């Protein structure tokens, strides 16, 4: 017998959105014992068992319409007939800056579309219905109705009469939603797990995401969308500056670490690689991974050995390129067919370090669980840390936490590749996944890598290349390159 699922009660409907024909397409639900930040937009079909809630909302609208027909009423519906809304926007745009008018117009366009947000669409496609409980439901009219009655010039008797009506409505609804008369609704859904940003406007969502970008370390990362009216990628995504170790992941043991004794002033001597103990894992270290400009050499294998905190050299050492971080300003932008992508705002010569692939470091067991869920969605952000052991202990998951690299798209003809950068030489289960340019990249050129692993980016064939976990689903490739394979993971 499965455990009983926790249910959540609807307190009231607080708003609605109409389609172009004036029909209701979404209701904004206030959940009992939850704040307005947990409000969710639900389609009418999800309220099939909440006739009392709908009836009260309709009564409230009629009452407000009768008491104040002026469109400036504080309780005027958020999405009136499209024509009237657009007219209102036109009237107010004269005193609003151009940038804000543009964001408002996009917001109006978005609200008038007969589709949900991306997250809502996914929930509907998977046929997950909202938990709307009618047992002992309390319908509480908005307190602002009482306050607003004073603004409308109502007498004390009228206010008292409204209070009595509210009590009568509440009692009648409790009776109507008793177990004897309530219908059985669809399976419950936890409001706290839903998109908590649906109440924000286009402008607010975009600015909130840009605020996240401003907090990223290093050169600026900007956001632009010249394709459609999606304000930004998911606001639930959190940017991090280093790996986020999860339960069961063992961090490197400092007792097993060692470093080199290279110069503390100029750092390692690029012309004398045999002196640096950090390269001892190479059979015959003939050169460092980097040249004098800090670019990865064309003859470098898939693994880069950098210095670490136990070395005598400083952070300015020429063998600490990845550790010094990103030097290129980047831009997250909306592509026409591939969702969000990333491009460089400056010219990047071949060999330039771009950034690292970050995320949660999870165990192989946890990765297996998540991999199944991600395959259901048709997408995965998992990278196995298996460069030194095919049976990898850990995997990097950038689904919810990560770097700008999380938005890198695939290409069958990529301009960047991923290297395994090791600096904890006695501990190879966790290492950096570092992106470098493998050809000259022009300003505003999209940064792409081969999701299946670039087999030929290095002339050194004795080492395998790092690749992300292969999805079980074949997906059509939209990279558009001349040598496109046609399918991802196929």
Curated annotation (Swiss-Prot):
Biased composition annotated in UniProt, kind: Polar residues? 115-133, 169-185
Q: Which GO terms describe its cellular component?
A: CLRC complex; cytoplasm; mating-type region heterochromatin; nucleus; pericentric heterochromatin; spindle pole body; subtelomeric heterochromatin
Membrane-spanning parts: none
Q: What is this protein called?
A: Histone-lysine N-methyltransferase, H3 lysine-9 specific
Look up the EC number in the record and give it: 2.1.1.355, 2.1.1.366, 2.1.1.367
Q: Which residues bind S-adenosyl-L-methionine?
A: 338-340, 381, 406-410, 477-478
Q: Which UniProt keywords apply?
A: Chromatin regulator, Chromosome, Cytoplasm, Cytoskeleton, Metal-binding, Methylation, Methyltransferase, Nucleus, S-adenosyl-L-methionine, Transferase, Zinc
Q: List residues, modification N6-methyllysine.
A: 127, 455, 464
């Amino acid at each position: 017998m499965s455990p009983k699922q926790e249910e959540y009660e609807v307190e009231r409907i607080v708003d609605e959105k109409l389609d172009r024909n004036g029909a209701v397409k979404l209701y904004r639900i206030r959940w009992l014992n939850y704040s307005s930040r947990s409000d969710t937009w639900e389609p009418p079909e999800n309220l099939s068992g909440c006739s009392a809630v709908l009836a009260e909302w309709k009564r409230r609208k009629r009452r407000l319409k009768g008491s104040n027909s002026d469109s400036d009423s504080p309780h005027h519906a958020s999405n009136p007939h499209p024509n009237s809304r657009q007219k209102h926007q036109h009237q107010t745009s004269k005193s609003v800056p151009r940038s804000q008018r543009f964001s408002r117009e996009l917001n109006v366009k978005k609200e008038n579309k007969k589709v949900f947000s991306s997250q809502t669409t996914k929930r509907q496609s998977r046929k997950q219905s909202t938990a709307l409980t009618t047992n002992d439901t309390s319908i509480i009219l908005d307190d602002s109705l009482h306050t607003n009655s004073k603004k409308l010039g109502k007498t004390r008797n009228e206010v008292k009469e409204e209070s009595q009506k509210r009590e009568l409505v509440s009692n009648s609804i409790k009776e109507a939603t008793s177990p004897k008369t309530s219908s059985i609704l669809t399976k419950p859904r936890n409001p706290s797990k839903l998109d908590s940003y649906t109440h924000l406007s286009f402008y607010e969502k975009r600015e909130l995401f840009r605020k996240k970008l401003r907090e990223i370390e290093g050169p600026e990362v900007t956001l632009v969308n010249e394709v459609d009216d999606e304000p930004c990628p998911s606001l639930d995504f959190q940017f991090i500056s280093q790996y986020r170790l999860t339960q069961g992941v063992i961090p490197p043991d400092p007792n097993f670490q060692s470093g080199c004794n290279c110069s503390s002033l100029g750092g390692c001597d690029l012309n004398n690689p045999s002196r640096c103990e950090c390269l001892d894992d190479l059979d015959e270290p003939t050169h460092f991974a980097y040249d004098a400009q800090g670019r990865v050499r064309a003859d470098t294998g898939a693994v880069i050995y950098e210095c670490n905190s136990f070395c005598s050299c400083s952070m300015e050492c020429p063998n600490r390129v990845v550790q010094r971080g990103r030097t290129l300003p980047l831009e997250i932008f909306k592509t026409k067919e591939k969702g969000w992508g990333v491009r460089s705002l400056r010219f990047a010569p071949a060999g330039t370090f771009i950034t690292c692939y970050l995320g949660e470091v999870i165990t192989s067991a946890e990765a297996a669980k998540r991999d199944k869920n991600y395959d259901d969605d048709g997408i995965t952000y998992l990278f196995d840390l298996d460069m030194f052991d095919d049976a990898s202990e850990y995997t990097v998951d950038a689904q919810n936490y990560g770097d700008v690299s999380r938005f890198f798209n695939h290409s069958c003809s990529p301009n960047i590749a991923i290297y395994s950068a090791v600096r904890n030489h006695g501990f190879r289960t966790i290492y950096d996944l570092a992106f470098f340019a493998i050809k000259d990249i022009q300003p505003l050129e999209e940064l792409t890598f081969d999701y299946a692993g670039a087999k030929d980016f290095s002339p050194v064939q004795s080492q395998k290349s790092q690749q992300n976990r292969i999805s079980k689903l074949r997906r059509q490739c939209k990279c558009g390159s001349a040598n496109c394979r046609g399918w991802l993971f196929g």
